[in-house]
C-alpha cells in the first residue's frame, strides 16, 4: 500500500481550502469583468438617423444583431418621422450621421453651410420605388395643371415632381401643392382630397391595390438620380474616421447577414415597417444595392454621384428652390472600407 502524500491530508471541506477556492473564483470573475468592461469601452456608440425606407432597415438589422461589435462600434439607429425632420435635426447638430437622399443633403448645405455633409457610402438606388401616383383620369404629368398634388415638405419630393414635369407645358407653380406627412398624404389620396401624390414604400402599399389610382411617373425614369447615401457632418469625418469606416463595414456585414439568413432578416425588417415579408420583398424589387467594388467609382470626384449632384443643383437653382452660391455635398472615397 502506498503511503499517504501527507501525514495530515487536507480535507475537502477544510475552511482555508474553501477560502482559497472562493478567492481564486472572485479573482477570475474580476479579471473577466475588467476585460468585458474594457471591450465595452473600446466599442464606441455610433448613432445614425434613419427614416422609414426599405434600405435603411439594414441598419436596424445591424443594430439588432450587434453586427458592429467586431468592428469596434455599438450601432444605434435614431428614427425620424420624415426626411424633413431628419434634415432639420442634422442642421441643428442633433445628429451627425444620417441615411438620406442627395436632394436632402443639398438642402443641408443651403440651410447650414458649415454642416454641409460628406457622402461616404452609396446605400441604394431607387429604380421605381419613388412614385408619382394619380387618379386614373390623369393620364400623365401634363394633366396635373390646376390639380391638387400632395407631397412631403422635402427637397426629394419637389425634385421628383420637377423632373416629372420636364418636357411638359406645365410648371410646378401651376399645381395646387398640399404638404403633409407620408401617412397623411396616403389617407388624403384615398379620401379623394388630393388628385395625385408623391409616395414611396412602405407608405404607398394601400395605393398599389386601389384600382382608382395609377403610376404616372417614377424614379425608374431618372436612373442614377435617386440614391440614398450615408451623409456625415464634416467635423465628424475629421474626428471619428475609424468609427465611420467601422460603420461602412457594418453596412456590408448587414447585407451579408441578410443574404445568409434571408427569411429571418426580412421578417425583422418587415415587422419594423409594419408590413408583411412579401410586401418588403416587393419594395426591394424597385431598389438596387451597389456593391462594395462599385463604391470607389460611384464616389469619385468626377463620378456619377458628383455629376448627379451638379445636375440636381442646376435644376433646383433654375426652379429657385436653392441659392446659387451655397456649397454642395462632397462625395469622398477616403472612408471606404472593404467588407
Model segments located where?
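Conserved C-terminal helix/tail region of periplasmic/extracytoplasmic solute-binding proteins
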Residues: 310-339
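Twin-arginine (Tat) signal peptide motif
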Residues: 13-21
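Secondary-structure end/capping motifs
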Residues: 239-321
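Hydrophobic membrane-insertion alpha-helices, especially the h-region
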Residues: 21-34
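Pocket-lining segment of extracytoplasmic ligand-binding domains
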Residues: 102-104, 177-178, 183-273
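Solvent-exposed, polar/charged alpha-helical surfaces in well-ordered, non-transmembrane soluble domains
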Residues: 66, 88, 92, 106, ...
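N-terminal Lys/Arg-rich, disordered targeting/topogenic segments
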Residues: 1-14
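Short, glycine-/small- and polar/acidic-enriched structural segments
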Residues: 33-171, 176-179, 195-199, 214-216, ...
Amino acid at each position: 500500500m502506498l503511503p499517504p502524500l501527507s501525514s495530515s491530508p487536507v480535507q475537502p471541506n477544510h475552511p482555508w481550502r474553501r477560502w482559497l477556492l472562493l478567492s481564486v473564483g472572485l479573482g477570475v470573475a474580476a479579471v473577466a469583468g475588467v476585460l468585458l468592461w474594457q471591450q465595452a469601452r473600446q466599442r464606441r456608440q455610433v448613432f445614425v438617423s434613419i427614416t422609414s425606407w426599405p434600405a435603411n432597415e439594414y441598419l436596424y438589422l445591424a443594430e439588432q444583431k450587434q453586427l458592429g461589435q467586431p468592428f469596434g462600434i455599438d450601432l444605434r439607429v435614431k428614427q425620424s418621422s420624415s426626411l424633413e425632420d431628419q434634415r432639420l435635426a442634422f442642421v441643428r447638430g442633433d445628429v451627425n450621421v444620417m441615411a438620406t437622399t442627395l436632394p436632402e443633403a443639398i438642402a443641408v448645405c443651403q440651410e447650414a453651410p458649415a454642416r454641409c455633409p460628406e457622402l461616404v457610402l452609396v446605400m441604394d438606388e431607387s429604380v421605381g420605388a419613388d412614385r408619382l401616383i394619380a387618379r386614373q383620369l390623369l393620364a400623365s404629368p401634363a394633366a396635373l395643371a390646376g390639380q391638387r398634388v400632395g407631397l412631403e415638405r422635402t427637397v426629394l419630393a419637389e425634385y421628383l415632381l420637377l423632373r416629372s414635369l420636364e418636357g411638359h407645358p406645365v410648371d410646378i407653380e401651376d399645381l395646387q401643392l398640399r404638404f403633409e406627412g407620408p401617412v397623411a398624404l396616403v389617407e388624403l389620396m384615398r379620401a379623394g382630397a388630393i388628385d395625385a401624390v408623391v409616395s414611396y414604400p412602405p407608405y404607398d402599399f394601400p395605393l398599389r391595390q386601389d384600382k382608382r389610382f395609377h403610376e404616372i411617373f417614377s424614379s425608374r425614369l431618372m436612373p442614377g438620380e435617386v440614391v440614398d447615401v450615408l451623409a456625415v457632418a464634416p467635423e465628424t469625418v475629421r474626428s471619428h474616421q475609424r468609427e465611420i469606416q467601422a460603420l461602412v463595414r457594418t453596412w456590408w456585414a448587414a447585407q451579408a447577414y441578410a443574404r445568409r439568413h434571408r427569411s429571418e432578416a426580412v421578417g425583422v425588417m418587415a415587422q419594423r415597417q409594419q408590413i408583411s415579408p412579401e410586401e418588403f420583398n416587393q419594395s426591394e424589387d424597385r431598389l438596387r444595392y451597389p456593391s462594395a467594388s462599385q463604391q470607389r467609382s460611384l464616389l469619385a470626384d468626377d463620378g456619377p454621384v458628383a455629376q448627379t449632384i451638379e445636375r440636381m443643383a442646376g435644376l433646383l437653382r433654375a426652379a429657385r428652390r436653392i441659392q446659387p452660391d451655397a456649397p454642395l455635398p462632397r462625395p469622398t472615397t477616403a472612408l471606404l472600407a472593404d467588407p
